Regions:
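Structural register within alpha-helical repeat arrays
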Residues: 9-10, 43
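Extracellular/periplasmic head regions of type IV pilus-like filament subunits
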Residues: 129-239, 260-330
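Exported/periplasmic cell-wall-interacting domains
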Residues: 221-223, 260, 381-474
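Gly/Pro-biased beta-strand-loop elements
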Residues: 311-407, 469-474
């Protein structure tokens, strides 16, 4: 339904029911067209105008689970804005309570008997100077692309040559292309940023400045990527580039979610690695040694609220490598109940794919959620929750590990989502508070995917809740 059709339906509704309000129309429209974001957005606007924040958030959330269309982006912005306002209101209430307590204590102190002595004058607070660091040296760039299985050797080499010759002019250094067999469900001739090759059909090094092939080798049949000296350099270069991309994506997503919830960026990256319940990240990742950086550069002054995500490229730049041609996007967790698969995605990029156990009898709730809490070593009888927990709904629903790994891939829980412990530890590393989680019953086929080496940042005792025994719907 486009905007014109929506307005026409609204006009027809009021002509037929002149005594009904706009709110009545929006409620009627969402019942007739539950998959259209435009109706849920306007219903949310009407609820918000009435001051009914809970109903407004529910409507905005439903619009984000609808198909993309008119007002989808507006609904997303309104949803996040209302969440931020709720968070700020909570802080204001707590601040008022704190100020009242301080005022009472001050009055007790001022009017109490006894001599008072002036203390030493307090030093004025000054912002910490961040030492400037040299940019990271340019690193060997590697791209992994999948190609159709039907190409002859001659066609394959010709099409890969056309691929490298058509690359963006921003690439000014020689780079390597790893050609892998077709990955079902993934695009062809498109960089697969977070795919770990098992087999390769060929490797080519290209100079985009002189537009010449520096070296190339083609295998008559798929060759193992993990063996042989020929691919040793490419293996090492790809591993470091993927590690750097993962670090930067994790940090940018955490900064973005922090801004969505608090309306500002943290003073330093270290503020992201707080204690529970403010633990956006378990730790701040350190750059790979070959980048020659002590820490990732952070420039919060470069942030622009009008283009929050896009400006994070300047706030936290990708050191040593070109930005991906298909831009990175905020991380999102998606669960397909039909295929028992949980995926971590960044826009068009599949970052990770894990098999999952879900609720029996459709007890895992379909819908749009956000990560509310992250708990290290969640307590439960017999270690039923494994090593990590990510709560996405306040009444007992979480993504967690398991002490029954044989259950993964089945419908056996009371509603929670189970992962292997190593998988939930990696997801816990990637995913910050506020990250979106979408659960769908749509029949999405399982996509075979080869994850890179595990990316796990150790979680400390400050992220544990030792005095809480959880009763999640495991």
């Amino acid at each position: 339904v486009d905007k014109v059709s929506f307005l026409q339906e609204k006009s027809a509704f009021h002509m037929k029911y002149p005594e009904q309000s706009d709110l009545s129309f929006y409620r009627w429209f969402t019942q007739q067209h539950p998959d259209e974001a435009i109706g849920w957005y306007h219903l949310g606007q009407a609820r918000e105008a009435q001051g009914d924040t809970r109903q407004a958030l529910a409507a905005y959330r439903q619009s984000l689970f609808a198909k993309q269309g008119p007002y989808y982006d507006e609904a997303r912005d309104a949803y996040q804005k209302l969440l931020r306002e709720q968070s700020r209101q909570g802080w204001r209430n707590r601040a008022r309570l704190l100020l009242a307590s301080l005022a009472f204590l001050y009055a007790q102190f001022v009017f109490s008997p006894g001599p008072l002595q002036d203390g030493a004058p307090a030093a004025s607070a000054q912002p910490q100077a961040v030492p400037a660091s040299a940019p990271a040296p340019v690193q060997p760039h590697v791209e992994v692309i999948a190609v159709p299985a039907t190409l002859s050797p001659k066609e394959l080499q010709s099409q890969v040559r056309r691929y490298v010759e058509a690359r963006r002019p921003a690439l000014a250094q020689p780079y390597t292309v790893l050609v892998v067999p077709e990955v079902p469900g993934s695009p062809l001739f498109t960089p697969l940023l977070f795919y770990q090759p098992k087999q390769v059909l060929g490797v080519l090094q290209y100079n985009p400045v002189s537009r010449t092939v520096i070296s190339q080798r083609w295998f008559g049949s798929p060759a193992s990527f993990d063996a042989g000296a020929t691919l040793a350099a490419a293996r090492g270069d790809l591993a470091v580039e993927q590690q750097t991309l993962q670090h930067v994506l994790t940090l940018r997503n955490s900064l973005y979610r922090y801004y969505q919830q608090k309306g500002t960026l943290p003073a330093s990256l270290a503020d992201l690695a707080g204690s529970y319940p403010g633990n956006y990240l378990p730790q701040v990742p350190l750059p790979p040694k070959r980048l020659l950086l002590k820490s990732y550069p952070y420039h919060p002054h470069a942030f622009q609220s009008g283009s929050a995500w896009a400006s994070l490229r300047d706030v936290l730049p990708l050191p040593g490598y070109p930005e991906p041609l298909s831009p990175l996007a905020p991380l999102q967790v998606r669960l397909s109940q039909k295929s028992h698969t949980l995926q971590l995605v960044s826009g068009t990029h599949l970052v990770r794919s894990y098999p999952a156990a879900i609720g029996k009898n459709d007890s895992t709730p379909e819908g749009y959620y956000t990560i509310l809490q992250k708990i290290n070593q969640p307590r439960g009888h017999d270690n039923i929750y494994g090593t990590r927990g990510l709560v996405f709904q306040g009444n007992g629903y979480a993504i967690h590990g398991t002490n029954h790994p044989e259950s993964i891939g089945t419908s056996v829980s009371l509603g929670c989502v189970r992962l292997f412990n190593a998988a939930v530890e990696e997801l816990y590393t990637f995913v910050s508070l506020g990250t979106e989680f979408i659960i769908s019953n749509a029949p999405v086929p399982a996509q075979p995917w080869s994850n890179p080496a595990l990316f796990i940042l150790p979680a400390g005792p400050e992220e544990e809740t030792p005095n809480v025994i959880y009763t999640w719907l495991h």
